[in-house]
Regions:
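A surface-exposed, charged beta-strand/loop segment in the N-terminal or early-internal portion
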Residues: 14, 21-95
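Conserved small/polar residues in nucleotide/adenosyl-binding loops
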Residues: 1-5
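Conserved interaction-surface patches within small, structured recognition/assembly domains
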Residues: 16-22, 173-177
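Short, basic/hydrophobic alpha-helical segments
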Residues: 6-12
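Active-site helix-to-loop segments that bind/position phosphate- or nucleotide-bearing substrates
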Residues: 9, 63-226
Length: 226
């Protein structure tokens, strides 16, 4: 509603999630309908900072959660699960680099992209064989640094205001980092909602270990998509 006029109407069955910014609200009836239909409903500040999420009744699969906790308490099993997530992240990064190399070969330094792709490819068997969480995090960091080294070259338009130099957070120092932080906030909300909808505990992760107030498993799930 804007000035008591309906701007648009959307059937709930066509929506997967709703994100409300600024001072726009939601009626109790809408929140209840979203919870009943497992439609994620999140509220963010005018600057895009995540504030709260409305969720329906948590799934009551206690056996699944017990298994999740047992795996999280076992370093070797935690490493195996975390390794699959990091493998997916590096694999996706490699093919993002390859796609840019294929589609925009005339606009980039192809030799740099080829070198980064080869470096990411070389990390994959190391990740698959790794049995230490700390070493996995180190390999993930190497892969991220390689990907970020060509990320600015993948931005092909609007470079005068939209560019990447280095990752910055709290606060992001440029438009690109602001977009990354904003997108990660929305993605974290979607991942946490998806985990809760199948009965998993979003706060107990494998790569990201326990930290009060942090949805560690949601952050784990995000890795392949970052």
């Amino acid at each position: 509603m804007y000035k008591r006029q309906a701007v648009a109407r959307y059937p709930l069955h066509t929506l997967q999630s709703i994100v409300s910014f600024s001072y726009a609200g939601a009626s109790p009836a809408l929140m209840g309908a979203c919870a009943q239909r497992e439609i994620g409903l999140a509220f963010c500040s005018p600057r895009g900072k995540f504030l709260a999420r409305v969720a329906g009744q948590a799934q009551g699969n206690v056996l699944l959660r017990r298994m999740q906790y047992r795996v999280a308490d076992d370093p070797s099993q935690s490493c195996r699960v975390a390794g699959m997530m990091i493998f997916g992240k590096v694999y996706n990064a490699k093919w993002s680099v390859e796609r840019t190399r294929r589609d925009h070969a005339m606009r980039i330094d192809e030799s740099r992209f080829s070198a980064v792709s080869d470096q990411l490819q070389g990390l994959l068997p190391q990740i698959a064989a790794e049995t230490s969480l700390d070493s996995l995090r180190g390999l993930e960091g190497i892969g991220a640094a390689a990907y970020f080294s060509v990320l600015d070259d993948m931005i092909l338009q609007g470079k005068e205001t939209f560019f990447f130099r280095e990752r910055s957070r709290r606060p992001p120092l440029d438009a690109f980092n602001a977009l990354l932080s904003f997108a990660y906030s929305l993605l974290a909300h979607d991942c946490a909602s998806a985990l809760e909808s199948v009965g998993l505990d979003a706060y107990v992760g494998y790569l990201h270990r326990d930290q009060p107030g942090r949805e560690s498993l949601a952050l784990d799930l995000m890795e392949e998509l970052r």
